Amino acid sequence: MEKLTDLNYTLSVITLMNNTLHTILEDPGMAYFPYIASVLIVLFTLHKASIPTMKIALKTSKCSYKVVKYCIVTIFNTLLTLAGYKEQITTKDEIEKQMDRVVKEMRRQLEMIDKLTTREIEQVELLKRIYDKLMVRSTGEIDMRKEINQKNVRTLEEWENGKNPYEPKEVTAAM
């Protein structure tokens, strides 16, 4: 535990690893050296961070199985992310949470569908009542001559001299 908090120890181990790798792989044409060094540094960091964390978690936690499972899943997910995979490992607890969320969303949507169906039924009933009221009334013949637009229209007998004043007359034009 003391070595985990000792920054100088951690930095000296990383420097030692880099120096060792440089001496092993002295070939300047080695293209994979940065990748190998990165992987080794990540593995070293995971080792140094996870073991003391798990020891503390196991001592302080009541349920050590869940802590171990969570730590292992987190480590594998980190390795998968570093490898470039988008998929992640999930535990049963996470799956149950997601299923609960999906079931909750489905219930909400079913309630909304039920409300919409009820509204549609009410609208159909309202339209039926309106249609029934319109069909019950009998429409008699309406005298279209007495409508607003037809009041000032005169018939041929009512015009003076019996001539239509709006009829076009012959017009001669001068050239």
Swiss-Prot record:
<keyword id="KW-1133">Transmembrane helix</keyword>
<keyword id="KW-0407">Ion channel</keyword>
<dbReference type="GO" id="GO:0090729">
    <property type="term" value="F:toxin activity"/>
</dbReference>
<dbReference type="GO" id="GO:0015267">
    <property type="term" value="F:channel activity"/>
</dbReference>
<keyword id="KW-0479">Metal-binding</keyword>
<feature type="transmembrane region" description="Helical; Signal-anchor for type III membrane protein">
    <location>
        <begin position="29"/>
        <end position="51"/>
    </location>
</feature>
<dbReference type="GO" id="GO:0005576">
    <property type="term" value="C:extracellular region"/>
</dbReference>
<keyword id="KW-0843">Virulence</keyword>
<keyword id="KW-1072">Activation of host autophagy by virus</keyword>
<keyword id="KW-0812">Transmembrane</keyword>
<dbReference type="GO" id="GO:0034220">
    <property type="term" value="P:monoatomic ion transmembrane transport"/>
</dbReference>
<keyword id="KW-1182">Viral ion channel</keyword>
<feature type="topological domain" description="Cytoplasmic">
    <location>
        <begin position="52"/>
        <end position="175"/>
    </location>
</feature>
<comment type="similarity">
    <text>Belongs to the rotavirus NSP4 family.</text>
</comment>
<keyword id="KW-0260">Enterotoxin</keyword>
<dbReference type="GO" id="GO:0039520">
    <property type="term" value="P:symbiont-mediated activation of host autophagy"/>
</dbReference>
<keyword id="KW-1043">Host membrane</keyword>
<comment type="function">
    <text>The secreted form acts as an enterotoxin that causes phospholipase C-dependent elevation of the intracellular calcium concentration in host intestinal mucosa cells. Increased concentration of intracellular calcium disrupts the cytoskeleton and the tight junctions, raising the paracellular permeability. Potentiates chloride ion secretion through a calcium ion-dependent signaling pathway, inducing age-dependent diarrhea.</text>
</comment>
<keyword id="KW-0800">Toxin</keyword>
<feature type="glycosylation site" description="N-linked (GlcNAc...) asparagine; by host">
    <location>
        <position position="18"/>
    </location>
</feature>
<dbReference type="GO" id="GO:0016020">
    <property type="term" value="C:membrane"/>
</dbReference>
<feature type="topological domain" description="Lumenal">
    <location>
        <begin position="1"/>
        <end position="28"/>
    </location>
</feature>
<keyword id="KW-1038">Host endoplasmic reticulum</keyword>
<dbReference type="GO" id="GO:0044155">
    <property type="term" value="C:host caveola"/>
</dbReference>
<feature type="binding site">
    <location>
        <position position="120"/>
    </location>
    <ligand>
        <name>Ca(2+)</name>
    </ligand>
</feature>
<keyword id="KW-0945">Host-virus interaction</keyword>
<keyword id="KW-0813">Transport</keyword>
<dbReference type="Pfam" id="PF01452">
    <property type="entry name" value="Rota_NSP4"/>
</dbReference>
<keyword id="KW-0472">Membrane</keyword>
<comment type="subunit">
    <text>Homotetramer. Interacts with the immature particle in the viroplasm. Interacts with host CAV1, early and late in infection. Interacts with host integrin ITGA1/ITGB1 heterodimer. Interacts with host integrin ITGA2/ITGB1 heterodimer. Interaction with microtubules blocks trafficking to the Golgi apparatus.</text>
</comment>
<keyword id="KW-0106">Calcium</keyword>
<comment type="function">
    <text>Plays an essential role in the virus replication cycle by acting as a viroporin. Creates a pore in the host endoplasmic reticulum and as a consequence releases Ca(2+) in the cytoplasm of infected cell. In turn, high levels of cytoplasmic calcium trigger membrane trafficking and transport of viral ER-associated proteins to viroplasms, sites of viral genome replication and immature particle assembly.</text>
</comment>
<keyword id="KW-0964">Secreted</keyword>
<dbReference type="GO" id="GO:0016032">
    <property type="term" value="P:viral process"/>
</dbReference>
<feature type="glycosylation site" description="N-linked (GlcNAc...) asparagine; by host">
    <location>
        <position position="8"/>
    </location>
</feature>
<protein>
    <recommendedName>
        <fullName>Non-structural glycoprotein 4</fullName>
    </recommendedName>
</protein>
<dbReference type="GO" id="GO:0044169">
    <property type="term" value="C:host cell rough endoplasmic reticulum membrane"/>
</dbReference>
<dbReference type="InterPro" id="IPR002107">
    <property type="entry name" value="Rotavirus_NSP4"/>
</dbReference>
<feature type="binding site">
    <location>
        <position position="123"/>
    </location>
    <ligand>
        <name>Ca(2+)</name>
    </ligand>
</feature>
<dbReference type="GO" id="GO:0046872">
    <property type="term" value="F:metal ion binding"/>
</dbReference>
<keyword id="KW-0406">Ion transport</keyword>
<keyword id="KW-0325">Glycoprotein</keyword>
